[in-house]
């Protein structure tokens, strides 16, 4: 029980405890996937450990069934070796992107997400239609959206952009990530134990905001 209590900051809930108990797994620990490098992963136990897939999971033909960032998994701990992921717990939701060149194929990029920050840059990237597509996907999966207008230093008429977003009736964060502006407001939209994701096209500032949130810049 104590180990599971330590996982609450990573999003472990009483509902997950009930799922875990119902599975009746023996000699395994719950963990959350926090990084995916393809052949290897990192998991929170809550301490961060290296992990790899069991032979069964590694041979799944449907790649959506293998662990993704945000998944809760059952792991077997080994001495002086990476933990072995034996099972993926049922997902509450997932976020996927289309695979380039394939009309119907999708690639899951994150699982069990609570809040999504949809980034639009106030330069050449601003697109209400792209935002609308993101919001549709989030609504299907019951993920709470927050709009982030980044690169606010690139315009003197922010209201011209915010007026176009009034129809959505969603929180809007005005940010200039390179200067650290708006980062604290983003943090305020994330409750303890919640999982957040940054969405947006290339170049809108996802990496910069991530680094600011992690204190790397």
For each feature predicted by the language model, list its residue ranges.
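A conserved segment at the C-terminal end of the G1
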Residues: 206-217
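Short beta-alpha junctions and helix-cap segments that line functional grooves
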Residues: 62-63, 134, 186
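N-terminal accessory targeting/assembly segments
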Residues: 1-128
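Amphipathic coiled-coil/heptad-repeat helices and related helical stalk/stem segments
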Residues: 101-102, 130-131, 158, 182-183
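Canonical P-loop GTPase G-domain recognition
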Residues: 144, 151-204
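Phosphate-binding glycine-rich loops and their immediate beta-loop-alpha structural context
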Residues: 108-170
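Non-catalytic alpha-helical coupling and interface elements of nucleotide-dependent molecular machines
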Residues: 38, 75-78, 90-94, 140-143, ...
């Amino acid at each position: 029980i104590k180990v599971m209590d330590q996982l609450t900051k990573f999003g472990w809930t009483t509902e997950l405890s009930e799922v875990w108990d119902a599975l009746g797994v023996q000699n395994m620990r719950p963990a959350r996937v926090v990084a995916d490098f393809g052949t290897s992963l990192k998991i929170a136990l809550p301490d961060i450990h290296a992990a790899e897939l069991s032979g069964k999971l590694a041979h799944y033909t449907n790649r959506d069934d293998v662990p993704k960032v945000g998944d809760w998994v059952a792991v077997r701990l080994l001495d002086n070796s990476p933990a072995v992921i034996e099972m993926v717990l049922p997902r509450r939701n997932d976020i996927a992107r289309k695979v380039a060149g394939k009309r119907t194929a999708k690639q899951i990029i994150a699982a069990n997400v609570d809040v999504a920050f949809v980034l639009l840059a106030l330069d050449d990237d601003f697109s209400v239609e792209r935002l609308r597509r993101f919001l549709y996907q989030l609504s299907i999966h019951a993920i709470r959206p927050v709009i982030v207008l980044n690169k606010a230093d690139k315009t003197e008429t922010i209201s011209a952009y915010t007026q176009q977003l009034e129809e959505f009736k969603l929180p809007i964060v005005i940010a200039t990530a390179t200067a650290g502006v708006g980062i604290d407001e983003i943090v305020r939209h994330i409750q303890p134990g919640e999982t957040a994701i940054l969405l947006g096209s290339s170049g809108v500032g996802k990496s910069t905001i991530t680094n600011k949130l992690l204190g790397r810049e």
